[in-house]
Amino acid sequence: WVKAVYLTVDGQPALDVADGLSVYEMEYDENGNLVKALHKDAKGDLMLPKRNGYAGVKNTYNEEGQCVKTEVLGIDGNPMFIAENGYAGIENKYDINGYVCEQTFINTEGQICDTRQGMARSTYVNDEHGNNLEQWFYNKAGNLCLNADGVAGIKAKFDSVGNLIEYMNYDVKHQPVLDNNGFAGQRFAYNELGLISEMAGLGVDGKPCASKELVYITRMTYDRKGNLIRRAFYDASGKKLMLNREGEAGWENTYDEHGNLVAYAFFGTDGKPCVSKGLH
């Protein structure tokens, strides 16, 4: 679609309550790629919606149809700096398989700039399936830097079907580092339905470490429909139940025939019912 107009019951221009705008307008190139997405008022003038605060987005494509630049637009139709993000646009580069391998954040003049996330450029290493094996963050001077999560890079591993099974965080010296959540990484296991059945926070030594919830390893059990029926917390050995910060070792969920959660019960390290200190 190229245009959406909000109207009252008598056919007069109306405002979308959530955004405060009247018209969404799209422009496409000859290949069907979205070039512009614009927000307009009832008079057809560009306006700033309530939720995102910009008048539109402009995309630029290369000969392969890949989006190489995305810019945020103001009411004058020119690039607009978004203070919340710390940039006005993003430039993309692609690897031989067509996956993004580099993103550069730019200001209204098209120059590289440091963002609110702490970096000016991100680089990616992808496998042939598009799984992101490595990601590194750089400032506008071209040096590795810590992002808002406190890491300079991430390395990840995936299983044969593309499930993330482990990632580790690294500092500017390529050494494992704890992020703002207190993890240097996480490890995951999956059941036959592809649902996460176990996850563990990792320390800089690659071994399970305690989360902010005071839990080392969390295990999940599901029914045949994929509903979570049990969540349990374990120590670093993975053999003993342990209490989290709320004073529970886990809980069990009960569902009705429609899959609606109708009850849950907390249990302690002895597997017996207990009182939780928190709200869930």
State where each predicted segment sits:
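Buried hydrophobic residues that stabilize the cores of well-folded domains
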Residues: 1-280
